[in-house]
């Protein structure tokens, strides 16, 4: 054990140093999600059900678009690892354009969905609440994509603190805005769920504005700004952003789609089940976002070493990340387990919702291993720019395994919401195992290194 620690010690330190600011930034996102759910839930259980539906739909779109922006990380990470700073700045310029185009396409698709939202089998009483909230979140999509472009760039150059501070500030602004607009403080009208949406839109706009100001004015970005301004557009970089970004987007999108489509199925069970699902999603995002921070650090480290052609440290960075991910999973799962009987009551006054939340803790705990496994090795594969097979893996794991199992357990066996949630461990663990095998196969060490 001591020998293993000595081998991975430097990687542990580097990953924690890189990942901790990302994790702290994600804690801000988690706190925002909790605050949203708490404030909306205590304002109205019906509004909580409406928020659950809309947030699930937009989580799919936002994670899909975030996945596309991840294509920048291995490009910038490789350039930064070989000291090509001007080219890294040029990559950012091209990434912002690509992200804007993707945001435009997604906005068109989501507008079409808006006009058909009444045909998705949701409870009739939720539709008047769903529609205005949906439109406000739709308006914020372009700002999410611009923020992601800057964030993936700064992560790729190992500056994870800038995005952390901007995220924390934006989320604090969002929480304050929620309180004022949901409950009608400072002389403003009580807007409920719509107020939460307006607050989210405003905070996302401000985060982009602040990121632009920091990039333009901070001296530490000077060597990158030369390439950003002077090297212009690059067909090669733009093409590579698309060849990397789309497979990652579809891989992440299919994972999220399994949760979003599960929310549609849960909506068939009624408002109480949908509200319970929203509470559990807020809790599950607590662990996912923490894993995400460490996974992003793995992608950066792997891309840096991959740019240098150092396969040994590519592998060690990935496995060190997995060790840390599992340790984090044990800690987080223990916290959730110890608080299992209180979680539902923190989010809503409804005893029915609180009881249903407690019943979902077991499937939640079971899938933590699979979630940590798939996040680690999906990011490791992104770091080595091996992303195309991830789409097939995601399709098998989430559409051929997770969704059918969820429908079978939830509706054929009549286990209800617990049955739908029992599918998540199957999908995430199967995805993790396939992604691990792909990474293991693609990073085999030469015999000379193996022997040494």
Language-model regions, residue ranges each:
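Short alpha-helical transmembrane segments in multi-pass integral membrane proteins
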Residues: 1-19, 76-142, 188-245, 302-367, ...
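Transmembrane helical elements of multi-pass membrane transporters/channels
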Residues: 17-36, 136, 147, 170, ...
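Short runs within selected transmembrane alpha-helices of multi-pass transporters and secretion channels
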Residues: 69, 137-155, 163-171, 196-211, ...
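Hydrophobic residues within alpha-helical transmembrane segments
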Residues: 20, 24, 54-57, 97, ...
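Helix-terminus/linker motif at the lipid-water interface of multi-pass membrane proteins
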Residues: 27, 31-49, 117-124, 180-191, ...
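N-terminal transmembrane alpha-helices
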Residues: 7-38, 42-43, 59-71, 75, ...
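Small-residue-rich hydrophobic transmembrane alpha-helices
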Residues: 48-112, 144-158, 162-163, 263, ...
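Transmembrane alpha-helix boundary and packing residues in multipass membrane permease domains
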Residues: 22, 26, 37-38, 74, ...
